[in-house]
């Protein structure tokens, strides 16, 4: 097998600047991800008292043990709907791809902690995209 050698100079100033910039961008992305996923503890507690679960927890319970799902559209509705207090994180619906009984599936769950699961235009688009991904990849959708 042919070995490819890199000409990347990790000691160059250009590399160091670009690496630093990339790490800064990754840090911002991770911060935004935490903001989108964060849920008010009192709202979660209230939901649990009613015998219900947040959307990501519902999906986690359906997935095979130890399965790490791929989330689609985490940033849907990011910085949209400024007129709605709290915005519409992930467009109020969670879409993940993961294994259920050993087979890949697209799993969709409406988030009851985002405006009680109400839909807006972008929620419809996200659900249609989930169906499209499932059809294109011949995956069941749950």
What are the language-model segments listed below?
Residues 1-142:
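Terminal-region recognition feature
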């Amino acid at each position: 097998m042919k070995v490819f050698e890199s000409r990347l100079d990790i000691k160059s100033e250009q590399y160091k600047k670009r690496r630093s910039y990339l790490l800064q961008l990754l840090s911002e992305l991770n911060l935004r991800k935490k903001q989108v996923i964060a849920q008010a503890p009192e709202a979660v507690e209230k939901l649990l008292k009613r015998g219900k679960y947040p959307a990501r927890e519902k999906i986690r319970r359906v997935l095979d043990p130890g399965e790490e799902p791929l989330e689609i559209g985490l940033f849907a509705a990011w910085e949209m709907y400024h007129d709605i207090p709290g915005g519409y994180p992930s467009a109020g619906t969670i879409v993940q791809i993961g294994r259920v009984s050993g087979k890949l599936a697209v799993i969709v769950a409406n988030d009851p902690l985002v405006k009680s699961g109400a839909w807006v235009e972008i929620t419809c688009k996200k659900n249609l995209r989930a169906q499209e991904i499932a059809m294109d990849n011949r995956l069941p959708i749950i």
